[in-house]
Amino acid sequence: RIYRDTRFSEDKTPYKTHLGGYINAKGKKSDHCGYYVHLEPGNCLLAGGSYCPPPPLLRALRQAVHDNIDEFRSIVEDPAFKQYFPVIGENFLKTAPKGFPKDYPYLKYLQCKEYTVACCQPDSFFLAPDFLDRTDDIFKQMKRFSDFVNYTIDDFE
């Protein structure tokens, strides 16, 4: 909904203060990784991943990370990746997920409640003449992460 009825309200703030666009090869309802652009004054970002996967899929993603930790670390700890995406996920478990050891050295990668990444950008990023090229560069850095997650989802289905 673009507008809300503010005729009789003291609070005249708009219903929605941002514009977002999401692209996913498997469709917007898919659990596969997609690419998201969020435009909002003072809160712009480029993001992607598998947001709020259902519990069985989340278990499969955690198992894939556990079983392929060297490959996963080579993706998410790559300096070129980390310069844009310093953190994996937004919400985390406080302890080890069920079925995984509490003393696992890379537990932080298993504690994710979703496998997403986000790159916050200043508003000026989207006003620059080369913002499409720079956006493309950022999403190219995210591709290996997306591929890892998508391969796991493909195997799960």
Where are these regions (language model features)?
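Aromatic- and glycine-enriched beta-alpha-beta binding-site module
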Residues: 5-66
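Compact, glycine/acidic-enriched structural inserts
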Residues: 39-99
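Short secondary-structure junctions and interdomain/linker hinges
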Residues: 9, 68, 72, 79-83, ...
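Active-site acidic/histidine clusters and adjacent loop/turn architecture
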Residues: 1-2
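Long, solvent-exposed, polar/charged low-complexity segments
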Residues: 87-157
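Generic ordered-secondary-structure signal
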Residues: 5-7, 23-24, 52-54, 78, ...
